[in-house]
């Protein structure tokens, strides 16, 4: 790997000649691959028992409770995890191992209001959604209109029920969400030095996205995060770069400007080391000290309400707001209740139902006022209300698929599961009754344990495929 001389000089100065040689050698080694289990849909135990051999899982990633290394090229004829139907059931997320650390460390609890400020493509947001367990609220934001599409897809695939996705600048969000959030994750844009082994384009673009450019963005993002955080709340700051100006010095500068913050210690396992320059509470993940590409992480607690702007009630919580983006209903609409009673098991979801156009949406907590913001996803889209009937969405299937009264399961290596994911109509046994069914994928020989891919309507032995066009895949 050919590195820019300016970068080499900087890293030698940071690490010293001997440790830099170890770092440089690690860049020539084979990178590690990671997969994180989505425990909203499958337990770690079931994942290992049913999918461990298929994916070729090797061992647990030590700084996670749901991440595993896998070896995609060790065996012949091994399918890549992203090519398997189980991926399309949202059972796991493919993620670089060290990138799993920040969201694991942010102490999110069910019921919290959480902001992922730089969220795309969604690896950390989906983990935060798992931690919330369907309670509280996750706001996942990304400023890029293009990248936010991947963010929405990954959150919907994971079955996260309590998320609003915004496509805004931190400045505009801060005007709405003043003092609103309990926890904020800032996975800041950075010079990407921890991506060099994984992505050669990161090496080529290093000169373009230099530290001084990135530091300016990071400084601004952190200051807006401060405005949006409640007293007593936590900011988890992370980068995938090694430059102290974007890491320890950025945190030091922020704390000097906002002295009401203090650093909290992070758990360090599997080769994770302390931050540099005496910042022992922070964490460094180096590629020559562990199996991962590299990260910096620090957690800050807001101790007092030092500035007047944080004492104001958040705009999105004010009772006087006349929200024009949606209409909150007093109860679930009759069309939805009728569908649930006929096709689902268990109690109807308890929370807030609201409509925007023909769409029925749901959140477990009071929906925030998002008037004036770009919001491509305003909660869980349950489906459409049209002509006095309810038609479920793909999001509904991914979030509540296990509650369908009727399910049809195809083996993961069958032609039928491939046909389903391509959006084709499928002939099924006459043993299946007519009506709505969850369509699921099962492990060969264990098709009674199916994982939901979507829905279909059976009529006279034919399964009408309801898998959405935008999701269809050739596998």
What are these regions (language model features)?
Residues 1-14, 18-48, 52-54, 303-475:
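Polybasic, low-complexity RNA-engagement segments
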Residues 109-110, 174-185:
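A short acidic, Gly/Pro-enriched loop at the edge of an enzyme's catalytic core
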Residues 111-120:
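Conserved class I S-adenosyl-L-methionine
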Residues 121-134:
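Conserved SAM-binding loop of SAM-dependent methyltransferases across substrates and taxa
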Residues 133, 229-231:
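Helix-to-beta-strand junctions that scaffold the AdoMet/dcAdoMet cofactor pocket
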Residues 141-179:
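S-adenosyl-L-methionine
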Residues 146, 182-223, 240-248, 269-270:
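Mobile active-site "lid"/loop adjacent to the S-adenosyl-L-methionine
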Residues 181, 234-237, 242-361:
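Class I S-adenosyl-L-methionine
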């Amino acid at each position: 790997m050919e590195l820019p001389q300016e970068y080499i000089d900087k890293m030698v100065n940071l690490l010293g000649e001997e440790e830099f040689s170890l770092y440089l050698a690690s860049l020539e080694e084979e990178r590690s691959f990671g997969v994180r289990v989505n425990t909203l849909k499958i337990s770690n135990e079931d994942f290992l028992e049913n999918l461990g051999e298929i994916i070729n899982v090797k061992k647990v990633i030590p700084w996670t409770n749901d991440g595993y290394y896998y070896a995609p090229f060790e065996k012949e004829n091994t399918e890549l995890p992203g090519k398997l139907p189980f991926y399309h059931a949202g059972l796991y997320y493919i993620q670089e191992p060290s990138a799993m650390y920040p969201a694991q460390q942010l102490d999110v609890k069910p019921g919290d209001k959480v902001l992922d400020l730089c969220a795309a493509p969604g690896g950390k947001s989906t983990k935060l959604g798992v931690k919330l367990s369907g309670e509280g609220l996750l706001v996942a934001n990304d400023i890029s209109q293009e990248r936010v599409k991947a963010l929405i897809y990954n959150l919907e695939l994971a079955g996260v029920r309590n998320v609003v996705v915004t496509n805004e600048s931190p400045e505009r969000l801060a005007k709405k969400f003043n003092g609103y959030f309990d926890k904020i994750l800032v996975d800041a844009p950075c010079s990407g030095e921890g991506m060099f082994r994984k992505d050669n384009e990161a090496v080529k673009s290093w000169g373009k996205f230099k530290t001084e450019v990135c530091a300016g963005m990071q400084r601004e993002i952190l200051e807006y995060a401060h405005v949006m955080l409640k007293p007593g709340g936590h900011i988890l700051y992370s980068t995938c770069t090694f430059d102290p100006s974007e890491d320890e010095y950025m945190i030091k500068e922020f704390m000097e400007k906002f002295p009401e913050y203090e650093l909290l210690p992070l758990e360090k396992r599997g080769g994770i080391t302390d931050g540099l320059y005496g910042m022992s509470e922070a964490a460094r993940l180096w590629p020559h000290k562990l199996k991962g590409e590299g990260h910096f992480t620090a957690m800050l607690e807001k101790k007092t309400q030092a500035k007047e702007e944080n004492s104001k009630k958040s705009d999105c919580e004010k009772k006087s707001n006349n929200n024009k983006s949606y209409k909150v209903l007093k109860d679930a609409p009759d069309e939805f209740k009728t569908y649930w009673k006929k096709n689902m098991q268990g109690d109807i979801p308890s929370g807030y139902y609201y409509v925007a156009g023909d769409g029925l949406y749901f959140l477990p907590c009071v929906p925030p006022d998002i008037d004036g913001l770009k919001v491509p996803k305003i909660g869980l889209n349950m489906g459409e209300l049209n002509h006095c009937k309810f038609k479920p969405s793909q999001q509904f299937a991914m979030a509540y698929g296990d509650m369908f009264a009727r399910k049809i399961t195809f083996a993961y290596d069958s032609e039928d599961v491939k046909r389903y994911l391509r959006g084709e109509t499928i002939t099924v046994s006459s043993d299946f009754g007519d009506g709505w069914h969850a369509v699921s994928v099962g492990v060969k020989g264990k098709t009674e344990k199916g994982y939901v891919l979507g829905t279909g309507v059976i009529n006279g032995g034919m399964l009408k495929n309801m898998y959405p066009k935008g999701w269809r895949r050739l596998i």
